[in-house]
């Protein structure tokens, strides 16, 4: 019986912190903060749309409209002004909006910290110790457009590839939750030369291509961007 008792507690705790996946119960159940505490902005937007879809809201967005049109329960109305939320639904929408605002504010602070980091590095004030490929970091972050980072759930990403016939270099930033990775991948051959079969003046036999990867990792902690893992250069 003891084992069953502990198992029941474990299952209860798991259910209590389970994250909300849809709004099937949002019309009758007040959602708790713990149920959405780990959800991303995208997922919170989905919950809001799911709640409205269950009321028959007709979406203008093509992708969203197509998604809900495939649901057997979705019955879009002709006039969206006729869609009315009850008190419980209004409370849930407010919760989603408040949580979304918090996440958006934190994301903007992270992006601002990255903009400041890039500006400081370009002024010659790099936070990367000199024995951690500091000169490569300066070149890498200069290529990254912070304002063009796009997000899917809690992951943000931007990369740019530069091919100058001599070789191909990829510069990127990857954000996963509170972890930020800035990297540079160097390839010893040109994709353009290879694809177009461009002949060089001195033709030589094919040779092994030298590749190398360098990256630096940061932690977004207490509203600050902290360099926390030494850079790695492989190749």
Residue ranges and their predicted role:
Residues 130-175:
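Short solvent-exposed beta->alpha transition segments
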Residues 109-125:
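Short, aromatic-enriched amphipathic alpha-helices that serve as compact interaction elements
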Residues 59, 66-104:
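Compact alpha-helical subdomains of small soluble proteins
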Residues 1-21:
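Bacterial Sec-dependent N-terminal signal peptides
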Residues 48-51, 55, 100, 121-125, ...:
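Sec/Tat-exported extracytoplasmic proteins
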Residues 19-42:
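Short N-terminal segments immediately surrounding and downstream of signal-peptide cleavage
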Residues 35-76:
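Amphipathic alpha-helical packing elements
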């Amino acid at each position: 019986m003891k084992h069953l008792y502990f198992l029941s507690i474990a299952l209860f705790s798991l259910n209590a912190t389970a994250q909300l996946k849809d709004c099937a119960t949002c019309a009758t159940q007040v959602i708790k903060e713990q149920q959405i505490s780990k959800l991303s902005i995208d997922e919170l937007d989905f919950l809001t749309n799911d709640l409205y879809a269950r009321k028959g809201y007709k979406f203008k967005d093509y992708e969203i409209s197509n998604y809900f049109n495939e649901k057997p329960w979705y019955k879009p109305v002709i006039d969206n002004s006729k869609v009315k939320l009850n008190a419980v639904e209004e409370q849930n929408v407010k919760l989603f909006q408040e949580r979304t605002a918090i996440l958006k504010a934190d994301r903007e602070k992270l992006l601002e910290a990255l903009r400041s980091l890039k500006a400081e590095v370009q002024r010659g004030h790099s936070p990367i110790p000199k024995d951690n490929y500091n000169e490569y970091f300066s070149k890498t972050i200069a290529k990254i457009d912070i304002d063009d980072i796009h997000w899917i759930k809690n992951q943000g990403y931007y990369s740019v590839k530069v091919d100058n016939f001599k070789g191909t270099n990829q510069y990127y930033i990857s954000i996963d939750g509170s972890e930020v990775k800035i990297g540079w991948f160097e390839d010893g051959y040109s994709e353009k030369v290879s694809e177009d079969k461009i002949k060089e003046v001195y033709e030589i036999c094919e040779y092994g291509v030298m590749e190398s990867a360098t990256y630096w990792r940061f932690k977004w902690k207490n509203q600050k961007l902290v360099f926390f893992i030494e850079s790695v250069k492989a190749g």
